[in-house]
Amino acid sequence: MHNIFKGLITAAITPFKDNTLDLDALEKILEHQIKYEVDGVLIAGSTGECSNLSFEEYKLLLQTSLEIVNKRIPIISGCSSNNTAYARELAAESTKIGVDGFMASPPSYIKPTQEGIYKHFEALHEACNIPIMLYSAPTRSGVDFSDETILRLSKLSRILALKDCGVDLERPMRIRTIVKEDFNLLTGNDEVVLAFNAQGGVGWVSVASNIVPNICKELLEKWYKNDVKEALEIHQRLLPLYKALFVESNPIPIKYAAHYLGLCANKIRLPLTEASYKTKKQIENIITSLSIKI
C-alpha cells in the first residue's frame, strides 16, 4: 500500500459562515494549498474543529473537499473519537466517500489502557481499506501510545505512519529503530519540525501552512536537499508565527490569521471563542513583518 503520509501536510481549518459550513471559503483555502503543491491536506482534524462538526457536516466537508481537489493532492480525514463505534463509523464513511487516508488519536477523556488503545485502532483498521496515520496528541487526549503499542500497531497492514505532536525529540529515533522502514514519522509541532526530522522524521503536519504553505514547503525542500543553513534561516524566521499560533487554543489564532488574509470569516464554534484583541494584534504584526499575502 502506497504511503501518502510524508512531506508537508496542512492541517486545514474549517470555514464557517453564520452557523453553517462556508464551502466557497473552503475552495479558496484548498486552492491556496494546491497552488503551492503541499503533499496533502488533513480535513476535520483538531485544527479543523472536528469535535464541533455534526456527522452530516463531516460528510459534506469531506465530499466537497474531494470535489474541489479532484485528485490533485491527497485528502486525509480526521477520525478521532472517544467512542470506538463512532470512530469506526467515521472511518467507514471516510472510506466510502473516497478520501486517500485517515488519521485518529487515542480516545480522549476516558484514558484507556495500552491494550484498549490497541483494540480501538484494531477496530478502525478492520473498518476500512485505506491508509491510517496514528495521531499522538497527549495534551488533547490525556493518554498516549507507548513505544510498544506503536510497534504493535505498525504491524497492522494499513497503519503506515505516526503524527507526533510531542516535544520528546528522542522518541522519533526510538520509534525509528523498532518499526519497519516504510512506517513514516511526522511531526505535528511546527516549532520542532527540523529537530524532529533530524531524528528520523519524514514530514510535517502543519498549522502554520494554512497561511504560509509556500514558505513551509521551501523549508522542507531545503532540508531534504541538505541545505541545512537555509532551512534553519527559514525556520528561525517563522518561529514567531509558530509561537503566535498557539498563544490561545488552536485553531483560534490560525482562524483569525486566515480571516485577516481574506481566506475565510473569523467564525469559530463554542466552546472555542474568537481571538482576544491582544492575540489579533500579535498575529497582524507578524503577518506584516513576514510580508505574508494570499
From Swiss-Prot:
Primary localization class, coarse: cytoplasm
Active-site residues (renumbered): 135 (proton donor/acceptor), 163 (schiff-base intermediate with substrate)
Gene Ontology biological process terms, A to Z: diaminopimelate biosynthetic process; glyoxylate catabolic process; lysine biosynthetic process via diaminopimelate
E.C. number: 4.3.3.7
UniProt keyword annotations, A-Z: Amino-acid biosynthesis, Cytoplasm, Diaminopimelate biosynthesis, Lyase, Lysine biosynthesis, Schiff base
This protein's pathway: Amino-acid biosynthesis; L-lysine biosynthesis via DAP pathway; (S)-tetrahydrodipicolinate from L-aspartate: step 3/4
GO CC terms in record: cytoplasm
Cellular compartment(s): Cytoplasm
Reaction catalyzed: L-aspartate 4-semialdehyde + pyruvate = (2S,4S)-4-hydroxy-2,3,4,5-tetrahydrodipicolinate + H2O + H(+)
Annotated site location: Part of a proton relay during catalysis: 46, 109
Domain of life: Bacteria
SMART domains: DHDPS (SM01130)
Signal peptide boundaries: none
Sites where the protein binds pyruvate: 47, 205
Pfam families per record: DHDPS
Record Gene3D superfamilies: Aldolase class I (3.20.20.70)
Subunit structure: Homotetramer; dimer of dimers.
Known function: Catalyzes the condensation of (S)-aspartate-beta-semialdehyde [(S)-ASA] and pyruvate to 4-hydroxy-tetrahydrodipicolinate (HTPA).
Annotated family: Belongs to the DapA family.
Name this polypeptide is given: 4-hydroxy-tetrahydrodipicolinate synthase
